[in-house]
UniProtKB/Swiss-Prot annotation:
This is Cytochrome b. Keywords: Electron transport, Heme, Iron, Membrane, Metal-binding, Mitochondrion, Mitochondrion inner membrane, Respiratory chain, Transmembrane, Transmembrane helix, Transport, Ubiquinone. It is found in: Mitochondrion inner membrane. Heme b b566 binds at residues 97, 196. The chain crosses the membrane at residues 33-53, 77-98, 113-133, 178-198, 226-246, 288-308, 320-340, 347-367. The cytochrome bc1 complex contains 11 subunits: 3 respiratory subunits (MT-CYB, CYC1 and UQCRFS1), 2 core proteins (UQCRC1 and UQCRC2) and 6 low-molecular weight proteins (UQCRH/QCR6, UQCRB/QCR7, UQCRQ/QCR8, UQCR10/QCR9, UQCR11/QCR10 and a cleavage product of UQCRFS1). This cytochrome bc1 complex then forms a dimer. It is a multi-pass membrane protein. It comes from Dipodomys microps. Signal peptide: none annotated. Its cofactor is heme b. A ubiquinone binds at residue 201. GO terms for molecular function: metal ion binding; ubiquinol-cytochrome-c reductase activity. Component of the ubiquinol-cytochrome c reductase complex (complex III or cytochrome b-c1 complex) that is part of the mitochondrial respiratory chain. The b-c1 complex mediates electron transfer from ubiquinol to cytochrome c. Contributes to the generation of a proton gradient across the mitochondrial membrane that is then used for ATP synthesis. The keyword Repeat does not apply.
Length: 379
């Protein structure tokens, strides 16, 4: 008698993806973040669905409806904080997942990597539109500033911005369409994530050594299901500590004031997970140049497979590249800090140096380090 999971059309799909999947025997905890991102997406879709039942996308009542959720709906405050902090958790896992991909050379699975970049853009768009929905001060002004960047596009810029706004400023039409897009995009993200997995399972997982592991594979279940489960328990422990004890730690106090088009906040800034890109945008005095740098700060990831000069895939045995990788991580943290500071000395020059360093490490220093390391292999 054949096992049902190997014959049933639906079970067979699950079996090939999560049960009998041949997996390298030496992948570390850094490979847990894929499953954790899946968990984050499920948390966001579930909590978002319940919030959408009580939220009204109208400029007059949006702020009040969020207040109503927190005060009058059973456990509404909990659902709201799970959703708000779930976005932060999503981006923490996302950045760690990308960092692992860069460190261990996973970007050589080009299709999987490029779909991952598309997923990053979709997630950033979803998070941005979600931040607008509570219609607080930072929601309104964040939406105004970020959508206004599109006006830097030559010739069609102004028309494009007014088309997105649905008028001559951020108003009811903007809020309404942002809610519609914010609702549908997570489902698109889930579908694209399936394609991401499909391409990954075509090649199999990478491993810390960056070498083919066909000779030493083990089944995904039970070895990695139990490992993923441990990751999930640790993640949820951290997450609920954040939600229940420090729910406003990562938020902006300005968003507790209703949106007022006549009163500009002293310092407009996005959520913490966009601050590194925001700092790069602000460090260039030209508007169009800033927008190009902003987009390139993410798109540059797509160049990684094409600019590697080292003969080894992983950074595990490449000390110079390791040093540059951790310099890049530090640089992104500096950019995140600068993005949250006002535009005044010495923050301006620090931001400009950090922005130049960000692109220089990836485009210039990493390839040079690869060439030096190739020569070191011959000694």
């Amino acid at each position: 008698m054949t096992i049902m999971r190997k014959t049933h059309p639906l079970m067979k799909l699950v079996n090939h993806a999560f049960i009998d999947l041949p997996t390298p025997s030496n992948i570390s905890g850094w490979w847990n973040f894929g499953s954790l991102l899946g968990l984050c997406l499920m948390i966001q879709i579930a909590s978002g669905l319940f919030l959408a039942m009580h939220y009204t996308p109208d400029t007059l009542t949006a702020f009040s409806s969020v207040t109503h959720i927190c005060r009058d709906v059973n456990y509404g405050w909990l659902i709201r904080y799970i959703h708000a902090n779930g976005a932060s958790l999503f981006f923490i896992c996302l950045y760690l997942h990308i960092g692992r991909g860069i460190y261990y050379g996973s970007y050589f699975y080009v299709e999987t990597w490029n779909i991952g970049i598309i997923l990053l853009f979709l997630t950033m768009a979803t998070a941005f539109m979600g931040y607008v929905l509570p219609w607080g001060q930072m929601s309104f002004w964040g939406a105004t500033v970020i959508t206004n960047l599109l006006s830097a596009i030559p010739y069609i810029g102004t028309d494009l911005v007014e088309w997105i706004w649905g008028g001559f400023s951020v108003d009811k039409a903007t809020l309404n369409r942002f809610f519609a897009f914010h609702f549908i995009l997570p489902f698109i993200i889930a579908a694209v994530a399936m394609v991401h997995l499909l391409f990954l399972h075509e090649t199999g997982s990478n491993n810390p050594l960056g070498i083919p592991s066909d000779c030493d594979k083990i089944p995904f279940h039970p070895y990695y299901t139990i490992k993923d489960f441990l990751g999930i328990v640790l993640l949820l422990t951290f997450f609920f500590t954040l939600v229940l004890f420090f729910p406003d730690l990562l938020g902006d106090p300005d968003n507790y004031s209703p949106a007022n088009p006549l009163n500009t906040p002293p310092h407009i800034k996005p959520e913490w997970y966009f601050l590194f890109a925001y700092a790069i945008l602000r460090s260039i005095p030209n508007k169009l140049g800033g927008v190009i740098a902003l987009v390139m700060s993410i798109l540059i990831l797509a160049l990684l497979p094409h600019i590697q000069t080292a003969k080894q895939r992983s950074l595990m045995f490449r000390p110079i590249s390791q040093l540059l990788f951790w310099l890049l991580v530090s640089d992104v943290l500096v950019l995140t800090w600068i993005g949250g500071q006002p535009v005044e000395p010495p923050f301006i020059i620090i931001g400009q140096i950090a922005s130049i360093l960000y692109f220089a490490i990836i485009l210039i220093l990493m390839p040079i380090a690869g060439i030096i390391e190739n020569k070191m292999l011959k000694w």
